[in-house]
Amino acid sequence: DMLVDTKNLKIFLLSNSLYPKSKISFEKFEIQNTNFLLRLKEYNILRNYFHNSKSKPFYIKKSKVFVIDENDETLIISPIDKINFTTSKQDDFKKLNIKGNLFDLNFKSLWKKKYVSQKNSQIEIDFNEPNILIKNQLNYNNNSNFNGLTSINFLNQKIEIDYNVKNNQITLKSDNNNNIQIDTKIELSPFNLN
């Protein structure tokens, strides 16, 4: 279970939901100065929420995310300046913007997904110092069958890696014009690296 310790929660209700016998409906909510405890086993629940949710926007400010393992040991503490989750049928995207810090590195992240795609998504993670930009395009079928393209910009170098996960095998391949060339297959069951 995800645990939340908050000191400041604001819920913005639609005015027509205040009348008697009406369903309460909110427009958005904001949370500030909150500690979120996220267990690793809850990752898929959170992922499915963002992919499948038709929820209203939410905003989180000046909070911390604690990632906890199955033994209740803290693996990661990430201070968050802000998180914005918005859904808009007008521009046909769900978007999750995060500005925070991970392992003493400031970052900005944008995840977005079209309403019409089932599980396909894009993510950009931009670290300030050192200046690293990571972009990923994911085409998702199911947990054992997905592929995508990851692009990493670092020190004026760009590396693009195509990846494919299918039938317990991971294939990684980079273009020949990259300074770093990758062409490998990893068998997951039994584990074997080629």
Q: Residue ranges of each PLM-predicted region?
A:
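Flexible beta-edge/linker motif
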Residues: 1-71, 76-79, 86-101, 108-110, ...
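Short beta-strand segments that buttress and anchor functional surface loops
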Residues: 1, 96-100, 122-126, 149-152, ...
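Strand-loop-strand
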Residues: 118-119, 130-194
